[in-house]
């Protein structure tokens, strides 16, 4: 199992600044407490930590790079790759994968070489295009493989599942008028966006809306299953489902002669369990890399804890990987077949989506791009090897593209977001603009005069390469200007540019952020607020996924907020009280 280092983490340099938020480091001494006690399970600072890979050697001989990892020399590759004709001589798992009937409803998705990314990363980087399937994700494979093994009696009664994502479309797809004539009942949270509800209904499924969360919907699905005698089709917790997902590994193995590593996005673990189990029996020299969003890293937490552990809050930006606890069966399957783990931040995922678009004018979903974001890490220090990233889906909510585009330019290192204070004097703005020269240019400017003592300026700068931003900050500080680099402060990206209005001239302000479902009852939310609180700032932002953010500044004593904490907890919405966020201090304090 993984061990925790007591040393401070050392951030490794990046192969490319394509994602400035993909990190590998030794876990800090308080790694476990950070997971379990933070309001956000992984706070902003946690983006700099990742579970240390336990099957890759350390190389301390690289000057200036502590703890760099180098690839273990692999065994000789298997020359004759198995086919269905050879399956009688293979273990049961491989035999079932090779004989899977999934091709009744799916196509063998292509593997494409990404020329631009390959040149930039110095490897042969391929993408497995599961976004080309009929429901625009890999989620047809597992459900159909399981349902095709059901008896006629079970098919006649119908099936049921709970989902708010791609699985909800994968289960009903083969039904009415298609391969399996069966009724599908899909239980979905009431907070599910209409675009997904409409998509599932269009496939002929009976949609049941229940609860505010996936867990509540899942509980109700179990009750309906027992009541109506339906067969449950789980999204990942079944051997037949995992074998269906394993057909992706079989295809990759046939499509590329030599594969050094496969980067797999992980939610509940069905995809990684299926792909990893296949490769470790056929090509054990191929490294299988888990890629998780750092605010939804249920597998990383469980591996570190050496048992399945549940995240208290889960970020929904990469909604296809939004799972609070890794599956029991999938976690057990992955223990001996996963080689490394990488955690990626949201702006890194956004940068990966942009790279896929630049490469072939295709837009993939956030969880689907996680595997590509994981490749940006400097962890491997390898050249000319064959790497594969699985693009698991393309069911992107159009509204979310706005947030993705904001994060992408910052995550890719093409732009930087700076905040600064200036004396409120005539000509200071012109002086500031004169500090920007050479290859740097403005893409957005927000300026507000607040007093003769101070004015606020927020700059979005276009830059190439990234190192110019450090020179820019040094130059501004040398000129006597206070500068904050808030490029990777997600709150600043979402809200900060809209808060440049100056101080409210009140004391004891406290900054609070709530994460609420997109369809949450706003009246219920406001009723719990204390009548003694003076609300000095309020901003609501729908982010186009399963959540929206409410940013508030409250003029109140902190002790009263602590007293009211139980009532806030009763709402069931994640929140964070923060008096020290740089964007908050820049925008609303004097």
From Swiss-Prot:
The ACT-like domain, residue ranges: 416-488, 509-580
Q: Which UniProt keywords apply?
A: Allosteric enzyme, Amino-acid biosynthesis, Branched-chain amino acid biosynthesis, Chloroplast, Isoleucine biosynthesis, Lyase, Plastid, Pyridoxal phosphate, Repeat, Transit peptide
Q: Write down the chemical reaction(s) this protein catalyses.
A: L-threonine = 2-oxobutanoate + NH4(+)
Q: Which Pfam families match?
A: PALP, Thr_dehydrat_C
User: Where can this protein be found?
Assistant: Plastid, Chloroplast
State the source organism's domain of life.
Answer: Eukaryota
**According to its record, what are the GO cellular component terms?**
chloroplast
A GO BP term, please? L-serine catabolic process
The cross-references to CDD domains, in alphabetical order and at most eight, read: ACT_ThrD-I_2, Thr-dehyd
PTM N6-(pyridoxal phosphate)lysine: list the residues: 139
> Is this entry keyworded Oxidoreductase?
no
Fetch the InterPro entries from UniProt: ACT-like_dom_sf (IPR045865), Ser/Thr_Dehydratase (IPR050147), TD_ACT-like (IPR001721), TD_ACT-like_sf (IPR038110), Thr_deHydtase_biosynth (IPR005787), TrpB-like_PALP (IPR001926), TrpB-like_PALP_sf (IPR036052)
Annotated tissue distribution? Found at higher levels in flowers than in other organs.
Question: To which pathway does this protein belong?
Answer: Amino-acid biosynthesis; L-isoleucine biosynthesis; 2-oxobutanoate from L-threonine: step 1/1
Q: Return the EC number.
A: 4.3.1.19
Give the enzyme class: lyase
Cofactor field:
pyridoxal 5'-phosphate
What does the entry report regarding how activity is regulated?
Allosterically inhibited by isoleucine.
Transit peptide segment: 1-44
What GO MF terms are annotated? Answer: L-serine ammonia-lyase activity; threonine deaminase activity
Similarity comment: family membership = Belongs to the serine/threonine dehydratase family.
> What is this protein's record name?
Threonine dehydratase biosynthetic, chloroplastic
Give the species. Cicer arietinum (Chickpea)
What is this organism's lineage? Answer: Eukaryota, Viridiplantae, Streptophyta, Embryophyta, Tracheophyta
